[in-house]
Structure formats: C-alpha cells, structure tokens
C-alpha cells in the first residue's frame, strides 16, 4: 500500500471527511488551548525579569480559538486586556521608541519575539502530541 500526499489542504479535507468537521475543530482547539497555555506561562515568566507593577503580567490573556478571516486556519490571540491599559505600552516595550532623536531600548526590549522563537519547537511538539491523541 502506498500513500501520496499532495498538500496540506487535501490532507485536512480527507481527515475532515473521515472524522467530521466538528470533531477536527474540537481536536485542533484543544491542541491550540494547551499550546497557548504553555506559551502564556513562558511569556509571564520572561516578563518577571523586568516587572515593575506587574500589570503587564496580570493583564496578559488569550482568546478562545477562532477562525481567521479569509482562511480556514484556527488561531488563538494573545492580548493585554484590563484596567491598566497595558496594551498601549506593550508595543513600546517590545520595539523601543525614539524621544528627542535618541533611540531608547527598554529592559523588556524584544522579549515577546525572543520568547516566541525560543518556545516554537516545544509549542509545535505540544500541538503534534495533542492532535495525535
């Protein structure tokens, strides 16, 4: 018996036809939730290194899995929601800023990108493990 895989969309369509769309979505949502919990936990640990009031850590949340507009991809959004409005400062902290012609790099400069890159392998392993279950 031989297997020929032509592309991911075809494989997904075949799996959906065997197991059903709702079952596949529930399985992928479970995998996304588990992997995003790992990422949030890792990100919160990294944010501890430059914590001031702790508001950025407290307001860090994740959305429920949703379907991206214009594609069939499922995703989870990491966002900062709360009374301290940390969402306004996260961008400045991640990318730095310029004031009076001088570039400033805060203590938390690039921490989200670094954490994302460092945890990518483990994130994918969690997704694979959950999808195989």
Where are these regions (language model features)?
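Aromatic/pi-system hotspot detector in well-structured domains
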Residues: 89-91
């Amino acid at each position: 018996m031989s297997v020929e895989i032509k592309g991911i969309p075809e494989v997904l369509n075949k799996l959906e036809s065997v197991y059903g769309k709702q079952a596949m979505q529930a399985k992928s949502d479970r995998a996304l939730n588990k992997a995003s919990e790992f990422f949030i936990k890792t990100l919160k640990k990294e944010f501890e290194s430059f914590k001031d009031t702790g508001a950025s850590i407290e307001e860090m949340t994740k959305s429920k899995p949703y379907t991206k507009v214009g594609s069939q991809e499922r995703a989870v959004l990491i966002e900062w929601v709360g009374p301290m409005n940390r969402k306004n400062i996260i961008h400045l902290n991640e990318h730095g800023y310029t004031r009076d012609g001088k570039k400033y790099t805060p203590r938390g400069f690039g921490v989200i990108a670094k954490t994302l890159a460092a945890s990518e392998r483990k994130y994918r392993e969690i997704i694979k493990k959950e999808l195989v279950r």
